[in-house]
């Protein structure tokens, strides 16, 4: 107490006057507000703060399209429950859980879901692949569903999890061909996995929907849309992710896609406000593979292309996977 009194008494009077003016004018409150707001946004967006958050339930029950997707997906899953096997891998001490729908083929599609989504979300996207003769793997990403983990790392750690799942399919189920189907963050994870030297050659292709250049651009577009883009807020949110996960929002698929060598199908909406069309075109142009196709949809919200135009979506997917039919006689 004496030390504190000595400290306060040693502070010149003019310093107290300046501090009083700053507090009274609210200038000091702005940075405090930014710090609090950035942590709130980060925790709401990329941190699992309770076991119930991001569980195996619809993420947007108030949205009719989301609920229609969920309903159709659940119908498909229930109709094929006899083909389902519960699967589990561990990577870096994190338990990861999924469901493998084995229809007797030696090839499988792995659905890489977006932020907030569990394996239940993947059912809806599995339908055209199952119709085309592929087994299906849907998984709870880390920090989602039944899987362990606290943070969504926007594809970075998830990409290493994806590689672990591919090795599981190869070693435990005899799968010889894998295709990634990634939505938003899942698309980023697919690109990171496929440009990682440790990725098995079993992965033969990549389908993306709503792929962004880096998560930072998507985050800024979200903040602008919701009128929450306060000056200085984004750098603090970016700092939260760096502090908690060691990864940067400013690094993304646009930095590595030139190393992509497998066939690529990009599905993208001209109305996407988060993963904007100009960046989608740039990602496509930069992709290193010569076997690539970009299919534009005139309408469709972010991650909502299949429910908006199911026939066109499924046709594009089936044409893409058709090229693998002669490579493996199944």
Please name every model-derived segment.
Residues 15-89:
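An N-terminal hydrophobic leader/cap segment in hydrolases
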Residues 126-148:
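Conserved alpha/beta-hydrolase
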Residues 152-173:
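Alpha/beta-hydrolase active-site loop
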Residues 173-184:
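Alpha/beta-hydrolase fold nucleophile elbow
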Residues 192-249, 256:
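Hydrolase active-site cap/lid region
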Residues 259-261, 266-268, 272:
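Short beta-strand/loop motif that positions the catalytic acidic residue
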Residues 273-279:
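Conserved alpha/beta-hydrolase "acid-adjacent" motif
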Residues 300-311:
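Catalytic histidine-centered segment of alpha/beta-hydrolase-like enzymes
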């Amino acid at each position: 107490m004496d030390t504190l009194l000595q400290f306060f008494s040693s502070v010149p009077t003019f310093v107290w006057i300046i501090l009083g003016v700053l507090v009274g004018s609210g200038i000091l409150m702005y940075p405090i507000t930014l710090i609090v707001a950035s942590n709130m946004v980060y925790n709401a967006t990329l941190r699992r703060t309770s076991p119930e958050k991001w569980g195996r339930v619809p993420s947007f029950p108030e949205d009719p399209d989301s609920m229609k997707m969920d309903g159709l997906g659940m119908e498909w899953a229930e109709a094929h429950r006899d083909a389902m096997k519960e699967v589990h891998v561990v990577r870096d001490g994190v338990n990861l859980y999924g469901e493998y729908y084995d229809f007797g083929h030696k090839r499988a599609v792995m659905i890489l879901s977006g932020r907030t989504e569990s394996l239940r979300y993947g059912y809806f996207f599995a339908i055209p692949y199952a119709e085309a003769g592929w087994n299906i793997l849907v998984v709870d990403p880390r920090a989602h569903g039944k899987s362990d983990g606290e943070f969504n790392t926007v594809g970075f750690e998830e990409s290493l999890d994806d590689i672990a799942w591919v090795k599981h399919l190869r070693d435990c189920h005899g799968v010889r061909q894998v295709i990634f189907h990634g939505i938003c963050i899942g698309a980023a994870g697919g690109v990171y996995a496929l440009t990682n030297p440790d990725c098995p050659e079993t992965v033969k292709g990549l389908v993306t929907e709503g792929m962004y250049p880096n998560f930072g651009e998507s985050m800024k577009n979200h903040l602008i849309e919701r009128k929450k883009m306060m000056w200085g807020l984004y750098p603090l949110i970016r700092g939260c992710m760096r502090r908690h996960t060691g990864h940067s929002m400013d690094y993304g698929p646009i930095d590595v896609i030139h190393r992509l060598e497998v066939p690529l199908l990009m599905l993208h909406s001209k109305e996407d406000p988060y993963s904007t069309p100009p960046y989608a075109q740039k990602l496509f142009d930069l992709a290193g593979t010569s076997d690539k196709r970009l299919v534009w949809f005139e309408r469709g919200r972010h991650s909502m292309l299949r429910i908006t135009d199911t026939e066109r979506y499924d046709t594009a997917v089936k044409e893409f996977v058709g090229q693998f039919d002669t490579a493996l006689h199944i």
